[in-house]
Every structure is written in C-alpha cells, then in structure tokens.
C-alpha cells in the first residue's frame, strides 16, 4: 500500500468524484463559482424529527430500519444553506451545521456524506441543455473536458442542466451512464498509445512566505 501523491500512466481518465476533484487537480476549466444558498440532503436513523430555520423538509421514510427486535425511524432532511466558495472548508462548515441541527442522543446512524448538486460545472466540449427521452441519448461531449485531452467527468459537474444532473446521478442511472461512458471512452482511445513517461502537474501559486525545508542532523535528548 502506498500513500501520498502518485503518477500513473494512462490513456484516459474518468473522474467519478462528486465535485470533479480529480479534474480540478488536472487543471480542467470550470464555470465561475457563484456563492449562494443551495439544497443539501442528509439522512439520520433513530432520531426524532427536528425543526430549524434551515430545514425546508423533514421526511420520515415509510420503512424503518430494524436491528433484531428494535426498530429505528429514518428521517431524510433537506436543508437550504449558503455555500461560500468551492473549497472543502466551506462544504465541511455546511456539513457541521447540518450535523449539529439533526443530532440527538437517540441517533444510531447517519449519512456519511451530504447529497447535493454542485452549481459549478466543467467547461465541456459541448454543453447539453435538453431533456433526453433516453439515457442513451445523452451526448458524451457534455461529460468531456474542453481543455484537458481524454478527461471525462462522470458526476453532477458535467455540463448538463442541474435538474437533469439530479436525475442522472441517482444510483441506477449513474451506473448505466458509467457503463455507457466506459464503452465510449474505450472506443475513442483504442488506438492511442500509453504515454512513455508520467507527467505530474505542478500548480503555480503565489505566496508571501514559502517556508523552508530542512533536516535535523543532530538529536538532543531531554532527560526528565
């Protein structure tokens, strides 16, 4: 098992992360982020339903979760909260607010992650603004990065309408589109050779203090 940053030689990449984070690391262009409120879904098990100004819906599911002889209610919340920017810090702040609003001592389980549809999309080869009669009619160009060769985004950051992204990213449609995309990508890269060398992208940043890298050559022992 290896940890840390690695470079893998490949013909193409399908980024299946929720917010296209791999595409971001590669420098894929995106639409400008617009700060504002958006909806987040979060599910808890065992708690009593909560009320808060940020909660716009609290739906108790018809089927509880049963463990042995015990039965636990399942509540799916929809929150309306502001997202300051596209950083993980802002998303973590939203998640903490939601967890604080819904937790009580009776909770036995909860969602690992928030479910939401990012407003920001990649710049694709060709945006799609329609409503397909079949998932097969979805053009793969809307999932392919415009400025990074052979990079596809299998997630809600594809350049499709946000309402459509919410439908596409449900488990069953997402699995089907993943298979369809895999077939498409395999055909397109069939005759492309694997790169002879791995290239690690270096981010260009500006900072006031870059710090210093050093090494301890002597060790002082402290006796207590």
Regions found by a protein language model. Name each.
Residues 224:
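Calmodulin-binding IQ motif helices
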Residues 1-12, 16-221:
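Flavin (FAD/FMN)-binding glycine-rich loop and adjacent Rossmann-like elements that form
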């Amino acid at each position: 098992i290896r940890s840390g940053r690695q470079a893998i030689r490949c013909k193409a990449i399908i980024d299946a992360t929720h917010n296209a984070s791999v595409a971001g690391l590669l420098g894929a262009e995106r639409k400008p982020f617009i700060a504002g409120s958006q909806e987040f879904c979060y599910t808890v098990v065992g708690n009593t339903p909560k009320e808060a100004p940020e909660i716009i819906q609290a739906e108790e599911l018809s089927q509880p979760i049963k463990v042995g002889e015990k039965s636990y209610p399942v509540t799916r919340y929809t929150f309306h909260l502001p997202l300051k920017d596209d950083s993980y810090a802002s998303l973590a702040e939203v998640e903490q607010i939601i967890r604080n609003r819904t937790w009580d001592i009776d909770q036995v389980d909860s969602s690992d992650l928030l479910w939401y549809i990012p407003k920001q999309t990649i710049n694709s080869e060709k945006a799609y603004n329609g409503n397909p009669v079949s998932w097969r009619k979805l053009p793969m160009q809307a999932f392919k990065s415009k400025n990074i060769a052979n990079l596809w985004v299998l997630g809600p950051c594809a350049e499709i309408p946000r309402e459509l992204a919410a439908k596409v990213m449900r488990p069953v449609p997402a699995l089907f589109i993943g298979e369809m995309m895999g077939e498409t990508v395999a055909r397109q890269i069939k005759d492309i050779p694997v790169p002879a060398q791995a290239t690690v992208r270096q981010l260009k940043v500006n900072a006031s203090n870059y710090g210093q890298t050093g090494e301890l050559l002597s060790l002082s022992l402290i006796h207590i």
